[in-house]
């Protein structure tokens, strides 16, 4: 029997398993498919400073862990040694200007260096951008990493029993205490159960009378190959809030929408890669069915990217992909003990990579009964 069974092979589950094993516990990680097969392997892989102050300690713990892991990773993964730069830009629209200022100032409040740019300075810095931009905010922020390599390395770096292709059907509990999980291949017994299954977490907890306020929101990326580099740093059209988390997803309430598919929330985030390719992101939409409901989204992402940076319109399309993000109404994850022998780590939205390492640290302390590495109060069940 294991000390702990962790359900979920995304970045959150793998970070939890890594930390628990580091503490000397006998850990079994159960994943229904492959490690990083979902949103954990289908994202920008960006370390961007969160806007919300309560997330900063969790973020900093994550960065420290990834830096240590990258030096001796069992699956080598890329990690920028320092910030590549993050430029937020806006046109003349008043709402866009306000959003850009607020986002930049929120990040700068955490100590990130900020420079305000006028129209001419934007053109000198990024000449490929559209000429209707009137204000910009350049942040000394943004480190890129390989999210798949990170996730797999977290699971394999320690002595973790990884069981792939095993679907968890229920939490095994008796006498008011969880003591394992029921899978397609039988029962996995453990003294503690950690549920880190993203938006699949609520159905596992519901039979125990525990409601997790988490819904799935689909996010898309488009992968392009421009003939020449388009931008030299991360560029976001103001109003998308790539840094801030999923606050806008509070409107993605299952009770309000039922089975109706809401309109997608689409912005523009350009990410230049070391290999010369370009990742385009900036879309969120409430998930209703397992497969994408709206094939127009990646097309619209590419169209808006070409408006922000016209040379993008000539780039070769290498592909597009999507992942499902588990989101909460306030943009903060739930990382807490929710019952005897039962811990939840889910609801990280688009910030799984940003907060994953810190989440693992907190879960390790919770399971061990040790003092937490930072204030856990903002991450309780609410």
Where in this protein do the model-derived segments appear?
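N-terminal Rossmann-like FAD-binding beta1-loop-alpha1 element of flavoenzymes
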Residues: 2-28
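Glycine-rich FAD pyrophosphate-binding loop
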Residues: 22-41
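Dinucleotide-binding Rossmann-like beta1-alpha1 core, especially the glycine-rich loop
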Residues: 44-125, 267-268
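Short beta-strand to alpha-helix junction loop
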Residues: 57, 89-99, 137-153, 292-297, ...
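Helix-loop-beta segment of a Rossmann-like dinucleotide-binding subdomain
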Residues: 77-90, 105, 114-155, 179, ...
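Helical element adjacent to the flavin cofactor pocket in flavoenzyme catalytic cores
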Residues: 137-184, 188-191
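Flavin-dependent oxidoreductases
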Residues: 173, 183-281, 287-292
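C-terminal catalytic lobe of FAD-dependent flavoproteins
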Residues: 290-382
């Amino acid at each position: 029997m294991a000390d702990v069974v962790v359900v979920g092979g995304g970045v959150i589950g793998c970070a939890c398993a890594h930390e628990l094993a580091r503490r000397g516990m006998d850990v079994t990680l159960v994943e229904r498919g492959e490690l990083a097969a979902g949103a954990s392997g289908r994202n920008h892989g960006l370390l961007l400073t969160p806007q919300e102050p309560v997330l900063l300690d969790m973020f900093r713990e994550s960065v420290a862990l990834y830096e240590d892991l990258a030096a001796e990773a069992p699956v080598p993964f890329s990690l920028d040694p320092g910030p590549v730069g993050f430029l937020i830009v806006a046109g003349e629209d008043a709402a866009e200007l306000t959003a850009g200022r607020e986002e930049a100032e929120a990040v700068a409040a955490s100590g990130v260096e900020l420079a305000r740019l006028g129209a001419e300075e934007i053109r000198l810095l990024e000449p490929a951008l559209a000429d209707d931009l009137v204000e910009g905010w350049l942040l000394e922020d943004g480190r890129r990493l390989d999210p798949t390599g990170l996730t797999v390395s977290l699971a394999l770096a320690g002595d973790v029993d990884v069981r792939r292709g095993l679907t968890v059907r229920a939490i095994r509990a008796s006498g008011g205490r969880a003591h394992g999980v029921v899978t397609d291949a039988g029962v996995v017994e453990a003294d503690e159960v950690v549920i880190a299954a993203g938006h699949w977490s609520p159905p596992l907890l519901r039979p125990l009378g525990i409601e997790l306020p988490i819904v799935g929101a689909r996010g898309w990326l488009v992968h392009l190959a421009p003939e020449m580099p388009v931008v030299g740093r991360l560029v976001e059209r103001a109003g998308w809030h790539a840094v801030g988390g999923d606050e806008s997803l509070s409107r993605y309430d299952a009770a309000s929408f039922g089975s109706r598919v809401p309109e997608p929330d689409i912005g523009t985030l350009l990410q230049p890669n070391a290999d010369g390719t370009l990742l385009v992101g900036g879309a969120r939409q409430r998930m209703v069915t397992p497969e994408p409901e709206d094939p127009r989204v990646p097309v619209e992402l590419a169209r808006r990217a070409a408006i922000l940076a016209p040379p993008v319109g000539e780039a070769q399309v290498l592909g597009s992909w999507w992942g499902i993000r588990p989101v909460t109404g306030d943009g903060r994850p739930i990382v807490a003990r929710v019952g005897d022998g039962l811990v939840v780590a889910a609801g990280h939205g688009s910030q799984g990579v940003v907060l994953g390492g810190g989440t693992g640290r907190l879960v390790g302390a919770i399971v061990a009964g040790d003092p937490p590495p930072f204030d856990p109060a903002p991450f309780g069940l609410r």
